[in-house]
């Protein structure tokens, strides 16, 4: 007698077979996930009276959830994520009182949360991210869902204040309400969630950043705090005492990006000794990059682009411990909810899978790059573009042998491109465009495999992939390099022979 049918992770096409339960009323598990099935969820599914698990995620299913699905009184897992399903969620979904996991993310569902959902009192995981759900979230009563550990309602159209009833879900470990239209302030009642480790409220309309920090720093279990796209045009609180020595004691990821915050990098960040990932991109932060960042023993990703930061690249930044010797200190625990790259939409389930990164692009930084940069041997991504850096590109950059992305474009670098950069064998994204570089692009290396756009805007550069030919004249120990452009214009530079 058939009790389980698992067809997951294949390449099946067509409709999900509607005969699944006609002759198999004792079936307990149906798994059609990760295939290419299309069409609607078959009617007749409600005849599977013993069914506990129904999975059909990552297919091409469309249409509404079939109405008879609420007859599955024993259902514990309903997983239909990553399809093209639409319509409203079943109004009587509360009849699925044994439901543990409801995963309907990445579809096109509309309408409000069904009030009957509060009857799913065994619900453990609720993920409805990336739909078109709407309504005043503050009016939904979460208090009966006391077994919830994960709630993800991100990327929908909910509005209103943060629902106070959420704070009755004492088992809650992860909460994502990002990319909605929520407003108001973070309430102190959130401190009732003693197990809360993951909090993402990005891209809403929250206010009072100072209040938010004062409250959240006391949430002892927090490891991930994502609050970017809120607190628009407020001042980053710089008071050294705002975060005590025990504040944010377990925090690993902190994001306040895309908020147009003013002020400087606050010194209280130096107390976050478990911080691994800090992003403050797209603000109006001024002042210099503080040397105390190097005292954060686990920091491996620093995003400060699109600000008003001035000064030089601090030598102290080259002493970040996790970028020098080992990423052993970086947390390798599975994240309670995945992190998504907003550009690539790449999904990260582990912090250790994220690139070791320093991004300082689009600021007012100046001066030369310190030779100490060669100490950051584990760096994967370095972006210093659109600043006012000058001087030569240091040879020591060739010691960054893990580099996959190096962007030095739109600065005032001069001299030649160091031939030693050819040792950066993992480099797949490179640009020195719009500087004052001259001389030949190192030949016989992968540096010549990049597009012309990686070198444009340097009148003195020559050699492939540029069309400008290289030539040189030797006068004793002095070499004159020149680039003969297609236009016939002569661009001359010089260097000493070795």
What kind of region is each of these model predictions?
Residues 1-498:
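Plant-biased, solvent-exposed loop and capping regions
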